[in-house]
From Swiss-Prot:
Localisation: Cytoplasm
Catalytic activity field: malonyl-[ACP] + acetyl-CoA + H(+) = 3-oxobutanoyl-[ACP] + CO2 + CoA
Quaternary data: Homodimer.
Active site: 119, 260, 290
Keywords, ordered alphabetically: Acyltransferase, Cytoplasm, Fatty acid biosynthesis, Fatty acid metabolism, Lipid biosynthesis, Lipid metabolism, Multifunctional enzyme, Transferase
Keyword Transferase belongs to the record: yes
Pfam families hit by this protein: ACP_syn_III, ACP_syn_III_C
Matches recorded under InterPro entries: ACP_syn_III_C (IPR013747), ACP_syn_III_N (IPR013751), FabH (IPR004655), Thiolase-like (IPR016039)
UniProt domain comment: The last Arg residue of the ACP-binding site is essential for the weak association between ACP/AcpP and FabH.
This protein's encoding gene: fabH
Protein name, UniProt field: Beta-ketoacyl-[acyl-carrier-protein] synthase III
Length: 340
């Protein structure tokens, strides 16, 4: 009796895009009651990129995706699933941003849909892509994390406007028969009892579009900062310890720990709890801020373009976001290294 050969999901390429406009801490000093010193001390953020008025989530996602496709060495016709993680879609509920990105890339008659898992979105997509590929249903999955967070930020609220930036990252996840190229583990979870920690109240079924929404600023992101900080450190640390223990991998053996880039103090606290060396921890929050679902792929792209990420290198991804959601992944980089 013939035996079906196992199929594994592999991380084949990465791409990213950031808008050209930079909003510095000095700029924010002129807009709200804050200082560069305070922002850097509390968050580690020095600047963030902001999309133009006529530049949308789908535009940024399509540009990142185009790079990922080119770097994977495949054609757009080879893609059989398009997934987008975003909480700042082009449209409130339909069409999906994944469908719009597919159209902008010229990808036709291919399944496409969005997921909403806030900052955990990209790693959530890895779980979906893995399931589709290892079931044999798909061979090349385009995953995108893209956000125009400036569209839901109140630039008179100093507690949130200092944190967020815009951008996009994308990857090609492909089928392979080589176990050493395949994902080692991915994990995602959620707890809706903390839903009010991070929320954009409107528009939605609870707060439909109305004058009240505009007057009360319900269309802007709201955040319980202190509570979110404490829970993020606790949850991220626990999640990483569990995935490492499950797979019998020591934290010191991870060359690239890529956490969600929300806040330097969160990243440092988690890194310290895991006894990670500074050279293991990837940091991009200083120049991009929190780009939500785009954060992790943008960070991966940063170390790939610099030549730091090599073929076969192990990546540990860890993220936490509104929902509340959290996710982690252990996987090798199966793409080509940058040639220098």
């Amino acid at each position: 009796m013939s035996q079906t050969k196992p199929v594994y999901a592999s991380f084949r390429s990465i791409g990213a895009y950031v808008p050209s406009k930079i909003l510095s801490n000095a700029d924010l000093e002129k807009m709200v009651d804050t200082t560069d010193e305070w922002i850097v001390k509390r968050t580690g953020i020095k600047e963030r990129h902001i999309a133009a008025d006529d530049e949308y989530t789908s535009d940024m996602g399509a540009k990142a995706a185009k790079l990922a496709i080119e770097r994977a060495g495949i054609e757009k016709e080879d893609i059989d699933l398009v997934l987008c993680a975003t909480v700042t879609p082009d449209y409130f509920n339909m069409p999906s941003t994944a469908c719009i990105i597919s159209d902008k890339l010229g990808i036709r008659n291919v399944q496409a849909f969005d997921i909403s898992a806030a900052c955990s979105g990209f790693v959530y997509l890895l779980t979906v892509a893995k399931a589709f590929i290892e079931s044999g249903m798909k061979k090349n999955v385009l995953i995108i994390g893209a956000e125009k967070f400036s569209s839901v930020v109140d630039y008179t609220d100093r507690s949130t406007c200092i944190l967020f930036g815009d951008g996009a990252g994308a990857a090609i996840i492909s089928a392979t028969d080589k176990k050493e190229e395949g994902f080692i583990d991915v994990h995602a979870s959620a707890d809706g009892s903390y839903a009010d920690f991070l929320v954009t109240p409107a528009p939605g079924a609870i707060n439909p579009a109305s004058q009240k929404v505009i007057d009360e600023g319900l269309n802007f992101v709201q955040m319980k900062g202190n509570e979110t900080f404490k829970l993020a450190v606790k949850t991220l640390t626990k999640d990483v310890k569990e995935i490492l223990a499950k797979n019998k991998i020591d934290s010191g053996d991870i060359p690239h720990f890529i956490p969600h880039q929300a806040n330097y103090r969160i990243i440092k606290a988690v890194g310290d709890a895991l006894k990670m060396r500074e050279d293991q921890v990837v940091l991009t929050v200083g120049k991009y801020g929190n780009t939500s679902a785009a954060s992790i792929p943008m960070a991966i792209n940063e170390i790939w373009e610099s030549g730091r990420l090599k073929t076969g290198d192990l990546m540990l991804l860890d993220t936490f976001g509104g929902g509340l959601t959290w996710a982690s992944a252990l996987l090798p980089f199966a793409g080509e290294s940058v040639q220098r």
